[in-house]
Amino acid sequence: MLQVYNTLTRKKEVFKPLKEGEVSIYACGPTVYNMPHIGNYRTFLMADNIVRSLEYLGYKVKLVMNITDIDDKTIRDSKAAGMSLKDFTDKYTAEFFKGLDMLNIKRASAYPRATENIDSMIELTQKLIDKGMAYEKGGSVYYRISSFPDYGKLSKLDFDSIIIGASVDVDEYDKDNPRDFALLKTSTPEEIERGIYYESPWGKIRPGWHIECSVMAMNCFGPTLDMHLGGVDLIFPHHENEIAQSEGATGKPFACYWIHGEHLIVEGEKMSKSKGNVFTLPEIVGKYGGEVVRFMFLSVHYRKKLDYSDAFAENAKNNYLRLKETLENLEFSLESAENTDYPGDEEVLKILPELETQFREALEDDFNIPKALTVFKELSRTANKYLESEKNRHVLEKLYSLYRQFSDTLGLFSESGKKEIPTEVMRLVEEREAARKKKDWTVSDAIREKIKSLGYIVQDTKEGPNVKETE
């Protein structure tokens, strides 16, 4: 039975979808104004892990992740870059998708852009005005948070701390200073000159950040969805304001389960440009490889801070390579194994269902991926122990099938499989085998080094030489 930690109630709850067997998820995506750092991608990967886990558990999942392509930051930085807002945000949207591919993050069902949903934002704003929950001031439209008694229920904000009538124009502000926030902002003369405005009943405007997500989520799912995901930094004001806007307009719960991922820190400190410890994904992937970075993110539960360091990444790399080697050895052994019974077969076949149950239970425990990884490592140990003895093809197929189920659910080894070895390398392998048969170890070792210089290693097994690319 799946249990999910709900930020709204601050406890684990049994998950009950709105529609049996199906799950609707909205995840806050990137604000495309720069290269996303590794902390951003940890949150995007959290969404991917949740989707993969739900699919493994038998659910049909629809994930929608927005792209914020108009807000304070995109307008400010596109101007500094001397680019149009569209060209600027298109550039960083493309970088965002490249990063998803680096980490083998599956594509969401949809990636709506804020600029494609302006009409709906104007409609929602008008609805809130009609209900007395929003008002126009100086060409901008503000949400009256005192009109929503539940304001603060997600962030546990003290409603009495609200300053009645005070408003704020910036998208991000402190929880200790709750104010009426902007739904739509009057465009400045400079923004109008740059073409960054939309006609509305209140003049030339552009949207505030918070209304964008409310509209895109409801346009995709209707008034209520199963899960809303994001980083802990979005709980206030962003997600709090989403609830106020959406539930204020519809009178219905906006999201049943709010799921938030913790921060990524670097060697115990928060990432900041002044400390020089802000790393982009391409920097880290260039150093360790995309799947190693993914594995590193998998090793810490999404509700715990991930403390990044080179030592932590190196440890993740070593663990990843051991698991990958097991997969390659299974694939190699399957090529020559026959259906002959051997002692130990029954023991392995008995262990596999137990490991499958443990893996499932880990995912059902608030998407406990680190716990699932521990089960995966146990499967690897079981496989390696079996590979040391005589091998039954039927048992190997069972091992390989479960190994692949686990790795696919974790998003690992997507490019694995028997790769074509270059002809020159295979010729050298044959020459080395001939030297070994003659017990000419000097020639055999020299050929091994030549093969290594070409980027391959040779492992001598009972079944013959196993050739692999070096990492």
Curated annotation (Swiss-Prot):
Its UniProt entry gives the catalysed reaction(s) as:
tRNA(Cys) + L-cysteine + ATP = L-cysteinyl-tRNA(Cys) + AMP + diphosphate
Q: GO MF terms on file?
A: ATP binding; cysteine-tRNA ligase activity; zinc ion binding
GO CC annotation, single: cytoplasm
Chain residues that bind Zn(2+): 28, 213, 238, 242
Motif 'HIGH' region mapped to chain:
30-40
GO BP term, example? cysteinyl-tRNA aminoacylation
Which cysteine pairs are joined by S-S bonds?
none
Name where it's found.
Answer: Cytoplasm
EC main class here is ligase
The UniProt note on the cofactor reads as follows: Binds 1 zinc ion per subunit.
Binding positions for ATP?
A: 273
Q: Per its UniProt record, what PANTHER family does this chain match?
A: CYSTEINE--TRNA LIGASE, CYTOPLASMIC, CYSTEINYL-TRNA SYNTHETASE
Q: What family does the Swiss-Prot or TrEMBL record give for this protein?
A: Belongs to the class-I aminoacyl-tRNA synthetase family.
Record's protein name: Cysteine--tRNA ligase
